[in-house]
Swiss-Prot record:
It catalyses: guanosine(46) in tRNA + S-adenosyl-L-methionine = N(7)-methylguanosine(46) in tRNA + S-adenosyl-L-homocysteine. This is tRNA (guanine-N(7)-)-methyltransferase. The lineage of its organism: Bacteria, Pseudomonadati, Pseudomonadota, Gammaproteobacteria, Thiotrichales. GO terms for cellular component: tRNA methyltransferase complex. It comes from the Bacteria. It comes from Francisella tularensis subsp. novicida (strain U112). The active site is at residue 137. Keywords: Methyltransferase, S-adenosyl-L-methionine, Transferase, tRNA processing.
Length: 229
C-alpha cells in the first residue's frame, strides 16, 4: 500500500462520535474520578507504563471497551497484568470509571481519544503484551468498509507496538469482517497464527453485550489470536 493510501486510511475514523445519553452516575464518575484513572491525550508524550501503573507487569491494551463490563472482569481476574482501555463514548468511560473506583481496581486505567492517534503518538514501540479488539463496528455497507478499525494499516501499527511474542486478539460476530481480518493476518509475515484458522472461543474472554446480541441473531462468533514474531 502506498504512503498516500495509508495516510488517507489514518484520517478516516472507525467510529462516529455520538452524543449518547450519559446517566447521572456516569457523569458524576467522570467529574469525580477522571483525574485518578483517565489519562489525557497528549501528542508529544510517551506513556511510561512503569510509572503510571507503579509496576513492571505486562500491559494489555483494549480498543473500544464499550460500557467496560468485560474489561473490568478481565482486570479483576488478572491482577498480575495491567490494562489500558480506550473508549471514545462518554457513557462507557463514565461507567468504567465508576467501577474502577468502587471495586478498587488497581491495574486498570483508561483513555478517551482516537485509538490510532494514541498508538502512534503515546505508546512506545514494542511495549504491549497484547492488543484486544472485541466486536468492533463492522461497518456492514461496502462503501463504509474503509472505516473498519482492523485494516492493513492498523495491523502494521499494532505490530510496531506489540512486543515480540505479544498477541493480537480480535473477536467479531460479523463473519465477512472476521474473514477479512484473518486473511490479512495470515498473509502478514510479522504475525503467526496461534491456531489453524479461527481460534476456539477462549474461556477467559468474558461474554460481552455485543456478543450476546450476535448470538441472539444467530451470528457465528469468531475469535482470532495471532502472535507477533
Amino acid at each position: 500500500m502506498c504512503d498516500k493510501s495509508k495516510e488517507n486510511l489514518r484520517q478516516i475514523k472507525s467510529y462516529v462520535q455520538r452524543a449518547g445519553r450519559v446517566t447521572k452516575k456516569q457523569q458524576q464518575a467522570l467529574d469525580n474520578y477522571a483525574a485518578k484513572y483517565l489519562i489525557e491525550y497528549a501528542k508529544d508524550r510517551k506513556l511510561d507504563f512503569t510509572e503510571i501503573f507503579a509496576n513492571t507487569n505486562d500491559v494489555v491494551l483494549e480498543i473500544g471497551f464499550g460500557m467496560g463490563g468485560s474489561l473490568v472482569e478481565m482486570a479483576l481476574a488478572n491482577p498480575a497484568k495491567n490494562y489500558l482501555g480506550i473508549e471514545v463514548h462518554k457513557a462507557g468511560v463514565g461507567n468504567i470509571l465508576y467501577e474502577i473506583e468502587h471495586q478498587n481496581i488497581a491495574n486498570l486505567l483508561v483513555m478517551s481519544h482516537d485509538a490510532v492517534e494514541i498508538l502512534e503518538n503515546m505508546i512506545a514501540d514494542q511495549s504491549l503484551a497484547s492488543i484486544q479488539v472485541y466486536f468492533p463496528d463492522p461497518w456492514h455497507k461496502k462503501k463504509h468498509n474503509k472505516r473498519r478499525l482492523v485494516n492493513q494499516t492498523n495491523i502494521d501499527l499494532f505490530a510496531k507496538k506489540l512486543k515480540v511474542g505479544g498477541v493480537f486478539h480480535y473477536a467479531s460476530d460479523w463473519l465477512p469482517y472476521a474473514e477479512e481480518v484473518l486473511e490479512l493476518l495470515e498473509n502478514d509475515s510479522k504475525y503467526r497464527n496461534l491456531y489453524s484458522g479461527f481460534a476456539p472461543r477462549p474461556e477467559w474472554r468474558p461474554l460481552t453485550k455485543f456478543e450476546k446480541r450476535g448470538q441472539n441473531l444467530d451470528h457465528p462468533i469468531s475469535d482470532i489470536l495471532f502472535e507477533k514474531i
